[in-house]
């Protein structure tokens, strides 16, 4: 692939790690953010120490506070901003774009107010003549590992397979590999909903339960994620892939996962507001729990783990009682789809 110009919107941990992947591939990378000290640090010290204390970025990776400068003459735009501000940033992009670009996003969540997937928001806000079909970049990927060039395999999903193949070529190299998929609904719901299950797995750890319990919540969590996704129109096979079970494993078992760490802290009895303040990063699984619970209620989808986490976070239920309460649910077949 010839050298491409790519704007990455959001210099958080994942946006920064992906900027290094693209830079390693010889592309022109521009990070955009709205925190002056962070942007100055990236440009002058070539570090982003809030997320990576010991990593020095290539000097060719530049950052800017000026969205127009970031978008000028780019071939592709990657959104890696928190779910709750995706629509706002997309509106700002739409007001500036003056040429057609490949639009990608690598965030994992559902918009709280509308319950919409992020690709749907981008499609609604950015005019079709200024963008490709949206490409979702998702899968099992800790930024802390990608930034040190550890082997990572993820998915590029789009309704337009050619757009997905473009993104596959854009990112893939000797340590970072993408597989294509056309099931956007499946990939996005898997990426968003697995954060809820990671909170649950972390809570079990914080409560002192062992591997048997964690394996159970991850496996049964995958079942309820799949049930909801299929109800929304996803292909069930997607949940067996990188963006499904792969992402669930990496997020539901690792201390790198902020959702797992948040769940562990909840299990230890810490208050949510203290957890969020101490972590200093967005915990997408908290907001997604509420959205998923509401969707499941509307559609009549059985999601006991999501319900238990929801009641603990939003109704003040004791998290241990909520989780143990699932052990007395009515007996079911492992393969029930409702």
From Swiss-Prot:
Belongs to the NAD-dependent glycerol-3-phosphate dehydrogenase family. Sn-glycerol 3-phosphate binds at residues 108, 139, 141, 194, 247, 257-259. It is found in: Cytoplasm. PANTHER family: GLYCEROL-3-PHOSPHATE DEHYDROGENASE (PTHR11728), GLYCEROL-3-PHOSPHATE DEHYDROGENASE [NAD(+)] 2, CHLOROPLASTIC (PTHR11728:SF1). Pathway: Membrane lipid metabolism; glycerophospholipid metabolism. Catalyzes the reduction of the glycolytic intermediate dihydroxyacetone phosphate (DHAP) to sn-glycerol 3-phosphate (G3P), the key precursor for phospholipid synthesis. GO terms for cellular component: cytosol. One of its GO terms (molecular function) is NAD binding. The gene is gpsA. This is Glycerol-3-phosphate dehydrogenase [NAD(P)+]. It catalyses: sn-glycerol 3-phosphate + NAD(+) = dihydroxyacetone phosphate + NADH + H(+); sn-glycerol 3-phosphate + NADP(+) = dihydroxyacetone phosphate + NADPH + H(+). Its main location: cytoplasm. The active site is at residue 194. HAMAP family: NAD_Glyc3P_dehydrog. NADPH binds at residues 13-14, 108, 143, 258, 282, 284. It holds the Pfam family NAD_Gly3P_dh_N. It comes from Streptococcus pyogenes serotype M6 (strain ATCC BAA-946 / MGAS10394). The keyword Lipid biosynthesis applies. The keyword Lipid metabolism applies. Keywords: Cytoplasm, Lipid biosynthesis, Lipid metabolism, NAD, NADP, Nucleotide-binding, Oxidoreductase, Phospholipid biosynthesis, Phospholipid metabolism.
